[in-house]
């Protein structure tokens, strides 16, 4: 049961989660980790993103679940007014503490034609839906330029 809910010895970095969500968002393309726009091999051939095989009916179920999470589930704090967001909250237990969790929120938007994948993590700060999802929402608002508020105010971090 621990693996099913992402606990125990299951370790995933934010970068790995972002790659997984990119694959879900696009339906098959998993970007390589890179800090540059395109990668070419030594013979100047463009290196296309990796792909993975997934049954399209399963992919549809996963995407639907991610949309429901934001529309009416634990990810509602990341909901945008005119742009559909797909995402999932998570809370990772902190070893050696009682009740302390790292809050996670992984998302992509727009859900029907993804442009951006976000992984928001708030260490030892609480649950994903109450802590990390609002952070992701502010980033999405800034990305899509749908907020008049500055990303951070009063010199306080998000």
Which residues fall in each region the model found?
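Active-site beta-strand/loop architecture of penicillin-binding DD-peptidases
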Residues: 1-48, 57, 66-148
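Intrinsic disorder/low-complexity segments
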Residues: 150-158
């Amino acid at each position: 049961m621990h693996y099913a809910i992402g606990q125990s010895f299951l370790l995933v970095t934010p970068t790995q989660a972002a790659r997984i969500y990119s694959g879900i968002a696009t339906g098959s393309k998993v970007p390589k980790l890179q800090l540059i726009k395109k990668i070419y091999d030594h013979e100047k051939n463009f290196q296309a993103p990796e792909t993975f095989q997934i049954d399209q009916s399963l992919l549809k179920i996963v995407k639907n679940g991610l949309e429901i999470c934001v529309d009416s589930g634990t990810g509602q704090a990341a909901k945008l007014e005119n742009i559909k967001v797909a995402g999932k909250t998570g809370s990772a237990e902190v070893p050696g503490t009682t009740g302390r969790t790292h809050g996670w929120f992984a998302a992509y938007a727009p859900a029907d034609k993804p442009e951006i994948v976000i992984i928001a993590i708030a260490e030892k700060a609480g649950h994903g839906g109450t802590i990390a999802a609002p952070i992701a929402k502010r980033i999405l608002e800034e990305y899509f330029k749908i907020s008049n508020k500055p990303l951070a105010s009063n010199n306080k971090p998000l």
